[in-house]
């Protein structure tokens, strides 16, 4: 089991980051809310990971702290929620915002996330609220919504295409992802900025 990585960021291609540890490159899938806080390529990062084994793949999911990882592990225990959907949920809102939405039973906020219908949102609220009772000491407590900010990477010529590709990887349909990016696109924006603003606008 790989629970933590400390190494140099080689490449950032949202929502994937390549981290080199001891000469080995680990490809890690990260929620965008965690991805935004990563340092730039060439710098050292510490990522808490959860290892998922499937018939066709072995995947690493990464987080900035143990609390975010704990929430991810609880999410994938929910009926109908796999790692991909859990990643999309924690990309659309921060871990703290998700906890707040569940505690306040905000179905409307959850259904705006990709892959979440009303029934899934209601099931998440029922199941997760019950689990939070025993997790608050190790997870989060209801609080004001947090807005994550971090320095954006310099804009690239294909920033919009990268943003669309990342949104598709998170579960949005290609046409929907293109529409989301085109609504907030501007020439000087990096792909990370476009993704963050597109997800924020969707909520």
From Swiss-Prot:
Chief place where the protein resides: cytoplasm
Positions of region (Domain III): 155-203
Cited function: The RuvA-RuvB-RuvC complex processes Holliday junction (HJ) DNA during genetic recombination and DNA repair, while the RuvA-RuvB complex plays an important role in the rescue of blocked DNA replication forks via replication fork reversal (RFR). RuvA specifically binds to HJ cruciform DNA, conferring on it an open structure. The RuvB hexamer acts as an ATP-dependent pump, pulling dsDNA into and through the RuvAB complex. HJ branch migration allows RuvC to scan DNA until it finds its consensus sequence, where it cleaves and resolves the cruciform DNA.
One Gene Ontology term from the biological process aspect of the record: DNA repair
Domain remark text: Has three domains with a flexible linker between the domains II and III and assumes an 'L' shape. Domain III is highly mobile and contacts RuvB.
Residue ranges of the region described as Domain I: 1-64
One GO cellular component term: Holliday junction helicase complex
Domain II as annotated region, ranges: 65-142
Gene of this entry: ruvA
Annotated protein name in UniProt: Holliday junction branch migration complex subunit RuvA
Species, as recorded: Escherichia coli O9:H4 (strain HS)
Gene3D superfamilies: 5' to 3' exonuclease, C-terminal subdomain, DNA helicase RuvA subunit, C-terminal domain, Nucleic acid-binding proteins
Lineage summary: Bacteria, Pseudomonadati, Pseudomonadota, Gammaproteobacteria, Enterobacterales
Pfam families, per database record: HHH_5 (PF14520), RuvA_C (PF07499), RuvA_N (PF01330)
Family of the protein in this entry: Belongs to the RuvA family.
Region (Flexible linker): 143-154
Cellular localisation: Cytoplasm
Keywords: Cytoplasm, DNA damage, DNA recombination, DNA repair, DNA-binding, SOS response
Assembly information from the UniProt record: Homotetramer. Forms an RuvA(8)-RuvB(12)-Holliday junction (HJ) complex. HJ DNA is sandwiched between 2 RuvA tetramers; dsDNA enters through RuvA and exits via RuvB. An RuvB hexamer assembles on each DNA strand where it exits the tetramer. Each RuvB hexamer is contacted by two RuvA subunits (via domain III) on 2 adjacent RuvB subunits; this complex drives branch migration. In the full resolvosome a probable DNA-RuvA(4)-RuvB(12)-RuvC(2) complex forms which resolves the HJ.
InterPro entries for this protein: DNA_helicase_Holl-junc_RuvA_I, Hlx-hairpin-Hlx_DNA-bd_motif, NA-bd_OB-fold, RuvA, RuvA_2-like, RuvA_C, RuvA_C_sf
Signal sequence segment: none
Domain of life: Bacteria
GO molecular function, one term: four-way junction DNA binding
């Amino acid at each position: 089991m790989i629970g933590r990585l400390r190494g140099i960021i080689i490449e950032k291609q949202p929502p994937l980051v390549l981290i080199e540890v001891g000469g080995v490159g680990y490809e890690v899938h990260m929620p965008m809310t965690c991805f935004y806080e990563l340092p730039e390529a060439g710098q050292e990062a510490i990522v808490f990971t959860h290892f998922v084994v499937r018939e066709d793949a072995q995947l690493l999911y990464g987080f900035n702290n143990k609390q975010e990882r704990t929430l991810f592990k609880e999410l994938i225990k929910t009926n109908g929620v796999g790692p991909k959907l859990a990643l999309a949920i924690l990309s659309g809102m921060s871990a703290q915002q998700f906890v707040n939405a569940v505690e306040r039973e905000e179905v409307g906020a959850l259904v705006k996330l990709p892959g979440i219908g009303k029934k899934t949102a209601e099931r998440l609220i029922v199941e997760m609220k019950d689990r939070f009772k025993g997790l608050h000491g190790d997870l989060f407590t209801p609080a004001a919504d947090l807005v994550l900010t971090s320095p954006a990477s310099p804009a690239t010529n294909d920033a919009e295409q990268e943003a669309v590709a990342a949104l598709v990887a998170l579960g949005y349909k290609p046409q929907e992802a293109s529409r989301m990016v085109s609504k907030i696109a501007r020439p000087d924006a990096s792909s990370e900025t476009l993704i963050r603003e597109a997800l924020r606008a969707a909520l």
